[in-house]
């Protein structure tokens, strides 16, 4: 039997071609086997992938192949998140149309992904920029529109005054447009929204059911939804302020009514109606409000900017102490779309309020005393106190806990009246805001609405869908090209026939990815959203992707299924039963003497953190491992790995050593070690074929110790790796295969010294080769197919069953017990698992180490704890 090296260059493309020709990964919806739906977050087609992109796809592939071997009908699809701003940037910078750029990238990246040997059903491939995909998305939009879950309202956006365009929050850098560098303005535009807040409580409650999601992700979603229970409090304007304010009271939402006696100011949003009323006649306030409009619109941008305030000169009466008044400010950190757009500031117990109070010389009155603190000396310095304690400086609340004080304030203010209203009203608020989906860009899904001066927003008739993007647009000037596409834009109103205009905003690309898993479920292109297919396949059994999508994408997807369920389009509420967030592949960075980044293939590593350029031997600075990035050139193309080591070596390395949820460093020594192990498995299988029993040999009636040990190792491997893969512990599965290879190697070496090889050992060798081939199949599928063929099978390993471990071989016949003498461990003893206490005691007393410790004396007592420990009392 030949033990030549495994030739990956020959085997890998050959087996991939066979899989494709036979269509073995094509999934049928009418397959009677139990379903298993595994998918990885689909990629944006940016151009080329590197090996770091492959880790999550390989993990998903291992699970898909394993489940297929377990007898499941596996759906493992792939697609392209192909709308988005980078394509428009390419159009501007390179003069290439977004469609051409995108489809060229899809073709290139698909070719690269296919190198990885992934068991994907390419028949269900989707591209979100394809009209066949976004036609259904437009129908879904109309479903939401007709059910009042999609609506239009005026909202603030980030406006670049130089490029004359709206910027996403991530495009605002330090308050300036990322391309023009201009100071960004906040401008109000009519925008489309999805009413995600209608499902806020349901989305929050259902997090508790997601027991196969990482705790960190669940916590992030809870915090993003941000449910709070508080009190809406009416602060009456002082008599001298009512006329100027044009109103009698300001409504404030607070989660800390217990701290009301510590209030030293009221702060209004720049967009609050009272602010706008005052600014209409006060140029100084109007200028302040205009200044507040610069910078980003995100909550993060507002939170991190310098805190500024404007004293309106108005005062309000303290709701619990009519003798006190509180000044009213306008502050740039108060958001109009949270609570009521007005807050009261208690500087002693909120850091933001404290910073504001110190800046404007406002009083700081602590009202919560920390446990054990002396009220006579406790004071707030540079840090606010936000911990537990008892109330003081608070009149009737003194001595109460925070919880009791909140309740007392709520009850009292609920009884007080301001006009016809209670002064206090209990209120639940959510941090979650409705999802603004409007984007003033070309390369996105058109919103199927027509605007008519007489009829308002009118839905495009469904028979006219899809509203396709026009191809004849230009990117030679700032702004949205759709605004300039008159032939496309100007249409008659579907209701009255009068001249009208198409909506020129396109949808946020997060909409595209919020339902693509539903599209995968259908194998019928004429029914892209098939309710029966969705009922069959959903929820996704295992979703794999980066934790950077923990909030927006995953939360929007959870909303989308609920919204579509409310519209009668699907039956499922939760889209993903299991979620796994993988770590990244990281790599060292390299710079030449001039500070230019270098690709790894341009560098020769010398050891001890030193390196030089391959072409001229000049020194190279080696940086710490970082996320693979094209800009820093610390990327490894999959082609390099495939050409040099084979894709299976790359797959093995990606699965090895590091827990899959952590970052893994790509190293030359690591990939070389993986290649050597692939060769070792190949060699061991070949040797087992040479020395072992022929295919289909009868099982011997009995096995000696050596054969039994090998069989235990092989059956244990099948059992252990199955558990590892089910629990997504791929690195542990790899470790178990390494451990087995050592036992397999010892058995092969033993067989080589025997002449002839005993029949029981020959059978065990053959059985072990077949088991290890099937066990590594999901991880190194090309190698496994080659081994399977060498073992004499004309079927495909990819369609083989997972090996069933014999239960009796999973239980060891012997057990090792520690021996303690006077409480100190002295040795271990291995005895039959069913040995009696008397037999164990006798064996212990025969041990030389025990005799030496007893020094010829008889022990006072020997205590045998069955299958646990032996205690000797001397």
Swiss-Prot record:
Chain ranges for the short sequence motif 'KMSKS' region as given in the UniProt record: 627-631
Protein name (record): Leucine--tRNA ligase
EC number of this enzyme: 6.1.1.4
Gene Ontology biological process terms, A to Z: leucyl-tRNA aminoacylation
Keywords assigned by UniProt, alphabetized: Aminoacyl-tRNA synthetase, ATP-binding, Cytoplasm, Ligase, Nucleotide-binding, Protein biosynthesis
Organism, as annotated: Azorhizobium caulinodans (strain ATCC 43989 / DSM 5975 / JCM 20966 / LMG 6465 / NBRC 14845 / NCIMB 13405 / ORS 571)
GO cellular component, one term: cytosol
Motif 'HIGH' region, residue range(s) on this chain: 43-53
Reactions catalysed, as given in the entry: tRNA(Leu) + L-leucine + ATP = L-leucyl-tRNA(Leu) + AMP + diphosphate
GO molecular function, one term: ATP binding
Compartment(s) of residence: Cytoplasm
InterPro entries the record matches: aa-tRNA-synth_I_CS, aa-tRNA-synth_Ia, Leu-tRNA-ligase, Leu_tRNA-synth_edit, M/V/L/I-tRNA-synth_anticd-bd, Methionyl/Leucyl_tRNA_Synth, Rossmann-like_a/b/a_fold, tRNAsynth_Ia_anticodon-bd
Enzyme type, top EC level: ligase
UniProt region (Disordered), positions on chain: 614-634
Cross-referenced PROSITE patterns: AA_TRNA_LIGASE_I
Top-level taxon of origin: Bacteria
Binding site for ATP: 630
